[in-house]
Amino acid sequence: MHIIFHPEDEMKKFINVYIKSDYDIVILRLSVIIIFMLFGTYKWFDFEVMALKPLISPTWLNILYIMFGVHGGSYFLGIVETITFLALSIGFFRPAAGILGDIIVIVTGLVTLSLLPQLGKVDSFVIKDVLLLGAGSVLLKYDLKNYLNIKN
C-alpha cells in the first residue's frame, strides 16, 4: 500500500486551520507585549533617559520633566509601559485586562504621534506608533468581542 503525499492538500489544511484559529491575534499581542516590555524596561536606564531628553524637552510632553525631573519622567513612562505589557499579557486570559492594555497602546500611539509637529522631524521613535495604533485597534476589537461574549 502506497500513501501518496499531496502538498496542496496539506497546504489547504494548514490554511483552513489558520483561518479558524486566533494565531494572528496571539502573534500580534505577543509582538506588542515585547515592544512595550523592551521600551518599558529601557526607561529605567540612563541610555534611554538621555535618548528621550531631546525628543521630549521641546514638546508638550516636557510637562513630565517639570513634574518629575528628567529621570522621573522616564520612570513614569516606564511604569505606564510596564502596566501596558502586563495588562496585555493578562489579556490572554482576562479580556477586561486586555481592553485596558489595548486602550493604553492606542493612547500611547496618539500621544507619541502628537509630538510630530513640535519635533519637526520623523524618526523611528515616533513612527513605530503608527503601527501601534493599528495593532491596538485590532486587539481592542478582539478583546471587546471576547469580553462581551463572556458576559452574555
Q: Where on the chain are the PLM-derived regions?
A:
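Membrane-interface extramembranous regions
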Residues: 2-83, 87-152
